[in-house]
């Protein structure tokens, strides 16, 4: 597992400390794995591993844009698998994407099949730093938690993050949540989910705090089943409340959307 990096604890010793790995200003291209994690595989049987994938202020190549592409994993099958995590598979691990202001990390290419450069697993992903993270692969087999605490995350491929939060929701249906934009603790930051002219459905709760923004470009659509938004929803795209769904728009700017709001 792990075509480029394997951060794994196969030790059953419960006293084994959690690991911490920093991956800074590093591009991953053309990596393959017969198992899981085409570029990166991380899992632990004890405490979660902590992985920091960062682009700092010093990165100047390609105008400050770092691109990870053409990574794939087969999951011990006959061909590439989204469930295996073409770019990364994270089990009991917490991964932070820390992108500096004015820098961009692009994972995947929309011209490739979505299985290439996919992210899968049940861990936790946190976006920090005021820079941009662009996800262009099919990440529907990522069922862990995702939090955008600072900066922008752009979804470049339709229906590519549908099942975020599913693992937690299966374990605790009474406390079910999916993707979170903004936070109470990091209220001084500005966090944004940017949906270009693509179509996205979130099965579990999409939650926005006061410092969170959901931008939906013209031609784009976001379908929500549950959750609430206390921040800003903007853009010329469409927000759809799914049939039998329930969504609370609580922010003063939550109706800044110039496109349609549709209730199925």
Q: What would you call each of these model-derived segments?
A:
Residues 104-108:
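Bilayer-penetrating membrane-interaction modules that drive fusion, pore formation, and translocation
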Residues 12-17, 27-38, 42, 47-89, ...:
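Surface-exposed loop/turn positions within long extracellular repeat scaffolds
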Residues 3, 20-21:
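Extracellular beta-propeller repeat domains
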């Amino acid at each position: 597992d792990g075509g480029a990096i394997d951060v794994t604890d196969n030790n059953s010793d419960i006293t084994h400390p959690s690991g911490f790995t920093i991956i800074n200003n590093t591009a991953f291209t053309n990596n393959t794995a017969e198992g899981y994690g085409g570029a990166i595989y991380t899992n632990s049987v004890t405490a979660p591993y902590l992985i920091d994938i960062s682009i700092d202020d010093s990165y100047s190549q390609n105008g400050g844009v770092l691109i990870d592409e053409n990574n794939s994993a087969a999951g011990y099958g006959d061909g590439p698998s989204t469930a295996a995590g073409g770019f990364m598979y994270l089990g009991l691990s917490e991964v932070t994407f820390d992108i500096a202001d004015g820098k961009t990390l692009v994972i995947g290419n929309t011209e490739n099949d979505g299985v290439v450069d996919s992210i899968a697993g049940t861990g936790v992903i946190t976006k920090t730093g005021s820079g941009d993270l662009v996800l262009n692969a099919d990440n529907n087999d990522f069922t862990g938690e995702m939090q955008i605490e600072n900066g922008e995350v752009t979804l470049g491929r339709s229906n590519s993050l549908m099942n975020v939060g599913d693992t937690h929701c299966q374990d605790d249906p009474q406390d079910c949540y999916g993707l979170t934009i903004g936070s109470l603790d990091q209220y001084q930051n500005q966090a944004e989910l940017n949906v270009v002219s693509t179509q996205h459905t979130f099965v579990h709760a999409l939650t926005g705090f006061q410092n969170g923004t959901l931008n939906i470009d013209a031609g784009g659509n976001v379908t929500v089943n549950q959750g609430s938004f206390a921040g800003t929803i903007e853009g010329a795209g469409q927000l759809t409340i799914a049939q039998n769904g329930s969504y609370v728009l609580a922010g003063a700017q939550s109706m800044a959307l110039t496109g349609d709001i549709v209730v199925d």
